[in-house]
Amino acid sequence: MLIAQRPSLTEEVVDEFRSRFVIEPLEPGFGYTLGNSLRRTLLSSIPGAAVTSIRIDGVLHEFTTVPGVKEDVTDLILNIKQLVVSSEHDEPVVMYLRKQGPGLVTAADIAPPAGVEVHNPDLVLATLNGKGKLEMELTVERGRGYVSAVQNKQVGQEIGRIPVDSIYSPVLKVTYKVEATRVEQRTDFDKLIVDVETKQAMRPRDAMASAGKTLVELFGLARELNIDAEGIDMGPSPTDAALAADLALPIEELELTVRSYNCLKREGIHSVGELVARSEADLLDIRNFGAKSIDEVKAKLAGMGLALKDSPPGFDPTAAADAFGADDDADAGFVETEQY
């Protein structure tokens, strides 16, 4: 069985709707294999929502104008295509817009039903004069990729229903690059950097997760041909290996004071792993182990990125130490000895 080092994935947030994802180390050649697959999936296969058709009061087709509206219907449709919406419904839903002039008509004037949200309310849709009036229905559906107005046109649809181009994808832009990275003495491993920019309807990390899920489902089809076939197994991640090493350390490595060290040894706590399995309350049950010893242990563990087992809500180690009669400064029956 061949075992490769498990890559790690980290996210560098550029802004709310743009992130860079770094995957490393990858076996030589896998950077481009994975990067190209992720990019194509992100651009074409992430589910989203979009307006698929509209109906404007008093309008029969798109090649006309609306009285009192500066923009013609074609320009109005171009503006509507820039709407960023999300929908929780699997079936088509209708949003309504009613506005009396004069003034601008924006996406904020749209009244969406429950489960539908307009994410760019400042988008200007039309301009009305003093006599202008705009009443419109907008049908929203879920889908993926791009669907043209011709494809959205339904057989036998009502007169006045105007299909529009639908851009379902919540992803605006995806780029990737592959760099060399080093693992021990080898310098030919791949480092994949994927830059993802999305619309306001979805965060980049959610789009990345959706792409990963889709690819796993598709590649699973090949795996099902023979689930016992040999492949390259991923070993433990570097983080997991480092954590295991830290937990295996003897408590001598923490360089605690003699008092704290001896108390822990008498309790049978010999490793960091055994220590983090105890809560503050557990440690205060140990004779002569008080609040100052608790603070010392917590500080040492924090330096390693570790912590004690969760204590009960509202737990105060100082008050508990007083209740137990533990005092780190003096104890008549306690004799300090050197570490052994």
UniProtKB/Swiss-Prot annotation:
Name one process (GO BP) from the record.
Answer: DNA-templated transcription
* UniProt xrefs under InterPro entries: DNA-dir_RNA_pol_insert, DNA-dir_RNA_pol_RpoA/D/Rpb3, DNA-dir_RpoA, RBP11-like, RNAP_asu_C, RNApol_insert_sf
Q: Into which EC class is this enzyme placed?
A: transferase
Q: Which organism is it from?
A: Streptomyces coelicolor (strain ATCC BAA-471 / A3(2) / M145)
Keyword Transcription recorded:
yes
Alphabetized Gene3D superfamilies for the sequence: 5' to 3' exonuclease, C-terminal subdomain (1.10.150.20), DNA-directed RNA polymerase, insert domain (2.170.120.12), RNA polymerase, RBP11-like subunit (3.30.1360.10)
The compartments listed are: Cytoplasm, Nucleoid
Does the keyword section mention Translocase?
no
Q: How does it assemble?
A: Homodimer. The RNAP catalytic core consists of 2 alpha, 1 beta, 1 beta' and 1 omega subunit. When a sigma factor is associated with the core the holoenzyme is formed, which can initiate transcription.
User: EC number(s) in its UniProt entry?
Assistant: 2.7.7.6
Gene name, please? rpoA
User: What family does the database annotate?
Assistant: Belongs to the RNA polymerase alpha chain family.
The protein's name is: DNA-directed RNA polymerase subunit alpha
